[in-house]
């Protein structure tokens, strides 16, 4: 048992030959479900020296990411159970939570990173209000610094579960006040979310983002925040809006508009739950970069979705 359970049982059940490699540098981590294999089911064991585990440092948050994190933290409550995605922006949320007045937070996440350790050291993580796995921080895999690896080592309060458990909406729905915080690349005026490609260029996989949005939607008191800076600079040095009239050709829809909850940029956050198509457009334009708002309004008119929300 190392830094994650992930899909081990599913892979082992499908394998014709099972070879285990012993890595003396991996921390021994407690597991919560199907984390063991009987020696009779193993065909070969390989031992030998290994390089030290990679230590990954998250880059510091930008000013825009810090403002996004402030909005997210302001809209959280004591006793929330957290899932943070990958990158500097969710990490900024975690670091801000560590300095906040919030109490009795819990962890139920796919990826465990250093910001959770920051929150734990600040006394924010107790897991005492969780409805399942109480007093335990649940994760799928851990990646970060040596300090993080030391924290999870033989720690009965930090346990790894397979993705089929920790990511499953059927699991998350049983956690009251579950809060999901993730990045994306772009959002269109309908609320469709792209978090894995720029056009046809693949940047990442779907990961657990959609799972956790579905889970947060059915968690009592649950919330989901999709965060993005309002613009990026392209190869020609031009500023480009991440909030677009329509997703660009080839953009992959990671999350359908029906699951969009809070969309947050450095200009604020908007709640899209229950909004009509034109209300979504109006709210999303309000958190776009000011330079692009008039242009987005004109596109919304052309698409037939620019109607003020007080006109139904």
Question: PLM ranges: what are they?
Answer:
Residues 2-7:
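Short, small-residue-biased leader/transition segments that mark boundaries at the very start
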Residues 8-16, 100-118, 195-226, 290-295:
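Gly/Ser/Thr-rich active-site loops/lids in small-molecule metabolic enzymes
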Residues 8-22, 37-48, 108-110, 114, ...:
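Structural signature of FAD isoalloxazine-binding scaffolds in flavoprotein oxidoreductases
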Residues 25-66:
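Small/polar-residue-rich loop-to-helix segments that shape phosphate-bearing ligand pockets
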Residues 56, 60-149:
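N-terminal active-site beta-alpha-beta segment that forms phosphate/nucleotide-binding
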Residues 109, 122, 126-202, 208:
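A glycine- and small/hydrophobic-rich beta-loop-beta segment
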Residues 177-264, 270, 279:
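C-terminal catalytic subdomain
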Residues 259-312:
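Extended hydrophobic packing segments that form well-structured cores
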């Amino acid at each position: 048992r190392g830094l994650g359970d992930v899909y081990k049982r599913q892979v082992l059940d499908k394998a014709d030959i099972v070879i285990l490699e012993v890595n003396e540098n991996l921390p021994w981590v407690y597991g919560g479900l199907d984390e063991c294999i009987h020696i009779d089911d193993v065909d070969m064991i390989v031992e030998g020296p290994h390089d030290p585990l990679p230590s990954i440092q998250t880059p510091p948050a930008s000013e825009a990411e810090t403002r996004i994190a402030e909005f997210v933290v302001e809209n959280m409550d004591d006793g929330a159970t957290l899932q943070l995605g990958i990158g500097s922006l969710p990490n900024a949320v975690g670091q801000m939570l560590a300095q906040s007045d919030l109490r009795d937070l819990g962890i139920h996440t796919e990826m465990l990173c250093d910001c959770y350790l920051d929150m734990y050291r600040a006394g924010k993580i107790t897991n005492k209000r969780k409805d399942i796995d109480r007093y335990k921080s649940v994760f799928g895999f851990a990646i970060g610094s040596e300090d993080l690896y030391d924290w999870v080592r033989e720690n009965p309060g930090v346990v790894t579960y397979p993705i089929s458990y920790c990511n499953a909406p059927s699991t998350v729905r049983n956690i009251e006040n579950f809060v999901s915080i993730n990045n994306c690349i772009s959002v269109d005026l309908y609320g469709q979310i792209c978090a894995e490609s720029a056009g046809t260029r693949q940047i990442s996989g779907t990961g657990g983002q959609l799972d956790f949005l579905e889970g947060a939607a059915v968690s009592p008191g649950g919330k989901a925040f999709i965060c993005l800076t309002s613009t990026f600079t392209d190869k020609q040095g031009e500023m480009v809006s991440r909030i677009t009239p329509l997703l660009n050709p080839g953009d992959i829809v990671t999350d359908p508009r029906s699951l969009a909850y809070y969309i947050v940029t450095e200009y604020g956050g908007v709640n899209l739950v229950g909004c009509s198509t034109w209300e979504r457009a109006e709210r999303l334009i309000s958190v776009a970069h000011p330079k692009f708002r008039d242009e987005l309004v004109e596109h919304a008119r052309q698409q037939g979705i620019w109607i003020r929300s007080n006109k139904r």
